[in-house]
Amino acid sequence: MSDSENAGRETGFSLIELIVVLVILGLLAGIVGPRIYDKLKGSKQQIVRLQIKEFEGSLQLFSFDVGRFPSTSEGLEGMVRNPGNLESWRGPYLSKSEVPKDPWGKAYNYRCPGQHGDYDLFSYGPDGVEGGEGENADIGNWQ
């Protein structure tokens, strides 16, 4: 073909080629997407377990300094602010100025004395309701 014959034709992908690419991308998303979603759900639960471990270390430091764990009414706030002007309090015991929330944006629950040990520290999980099974199960320091 001469240059004059090609001048009217535009280069690019045909409609069939675009449809084939979209079908392939859709198949890949259908296969890979659910697996990635399951991993993301599991990673939030793992974050809760790691944050609880961090809280446990900080609670131990509080206990060494004050001679006891924070009461239920003092809660985890006692880790970042002196609850009731305790003379032996040497905090803050957490690296942040606020108590972190769980990955679902809800406050961690704390009880002292606990039902499972000296204290109970737990998240109600993604549903935010006590109990639950599977991905909605509560995650606590006693598990």
Which residues are covered by each model-predicted region?
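Alpha-helical hydrophobic helix detector
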Residues: I19-R35
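N-terminal leader/signal peptides at the extreme start of proteins
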Residues: M1-F13
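Short, surface-exposed interaction loops/tails
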Residues: S2-E5, D38, G42-Q46, G57-Q60, ...
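Conserved loop-to-helix junction within protein kinase catalytic domains, corresponding to the end
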Residues: T72-L76
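Hydrophobic positions in long alpha-helices of the protein kinase catalytic C-lobe
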Residues: V48-I52
